[in-house]
Amino acid sequence: MSNEKARENAAEEKAERSLLGASSITGSMTLVSRFLGLARDVVIARLFGASDAADAFFLANKIPNFLRRLFAEGAFNQAFVPVLSEYRSLRSHDDVRELIAAVAASLGGIITLISVVVMIAAPVIAIPLAYGFNDEPGKFALFVEMLRITFPYLLLISMTALCGAVLNSYGRFAVPAITPALLNICLIGSAFLLAPYLHTPELALAWGVLIAGVAQLLFQLPFLAQMRLLPMPKPSAGHEGVARIKTLMLPALFGVSVNQINLLLDSFIASLLVSGSVSWLYFSDRLMELPLGTFGVALAIVVLPSLSRKHAENSLAEFTQTLDWALRLVFLIAVPAALALVMLAKPLLITLFHNDNFSVNDVQQAAGSLQAYALGLLGFMAVKVFAPGFYARQDTRTPVRIAMIALAVNMLLNVVFYLQGFAHVGLAAATSIAACVNAGLLLRGLLQQGAFRFARGWGVWLLRLAAANSALAAFLYTQAGMWRDWLEWSASAQIMHMAILVGGGLAVYAIVLVAAGLRWRDVYR
């Protein structure tokens, strides 16, 4: 065995010894990015509010981001990481480089073609995507312009996702996890520095997205160069690894991204509602993404390679133990996070977004959809854990069937809630219910296939969580006060009170958990 291969294996074994450590690194870097994202949303809300132009940007930006999560991150990662791991273990470093080059050429070629078509045909494509804007020519034209500006981001971020997948596979989790922070920095900078010079200030956000795509890709390349794995696109017709990745990707494209399809449907129907609906959904979704994007995604990133190795080693006991550990962490994090988002929805929105451009009505409307999204947080995070349980075993068909059921549930509920007049809150509720259905069916599938079983101690675990969350709810209820009182406070008073609620809530939650018997060994793996 070469020294290089020995170093790689040693790093992999070290990462394997502590899934919690790897998750913590990924989660902490992601948390930095999420806080910058929160700062970005505060800037956008305070500078642009919930205007027609803001609606146009959020919807235009959602299209390439949806495709990014569909192609570049979701299904691609599920297909690429297992094949790359196999090449690392069984083949030479040159073979790994050839695989990366071939994948870069194939993925880049497909995304480039899609981007060119969309940019040319944007006015036609925009008709169904922003159907609710068709009666407002100015808003529709702005959406088309923003779509053309933001769509090349898909190609840039797809290459960034490829680089990130390679880095994650080699145990270098921090760099890909911090990369999204550059998007937030670019958007904040564009809002302050570029917006004053444009005829429509919100266009600065679209240009900020494109600038961020370039920055994110350039940021990761030096780290790959150090590993001698810089992706130099090189077409390789019939490359065995690329063919296998495509085979795995096709069914995974739908299954792994059902939540994104649900959110896209929400935005489409929201465009039919009153002005501001798209923005209300956006801001509430962003706050819900704080716990989901920080902890849920971190778990998914770390768990997939671990489960893939367990399956390759035919170690069913360790496979199911890893899933059980991840599910316990989901409950540990998702339940209190959802509880806090529901109880503090309006104070949180007031503290972060309320000003002349984001009115009291905007706060009330966004709070409704935030609470609806929060109720599905456990389901959203559970999907992040359960889906890798199938993909690690190269079973892509079961998640697809389940995703189709969940999507049908979401579409049906969207229509029902829309007709019942629940507006944007109904759309958020439908997405949450569909996520819970998705998670429940994935769990049932894992149990039926014998790939997962609940370990001993779940009853005690749930009792501890019930006690801790009850204490947390009591603390928030007694200390938060009436939400309208927050409107009278200064910004510094709002921030201080929110910090006390968050810090005090975390302390109460942790103290009760420890008092109930939770120990480090219960969460460390």
Segments and roles (model prediction):
Residues S2-R525:
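Membrane-embedded alpha-helical bundles of multi-pass transporters/translocases
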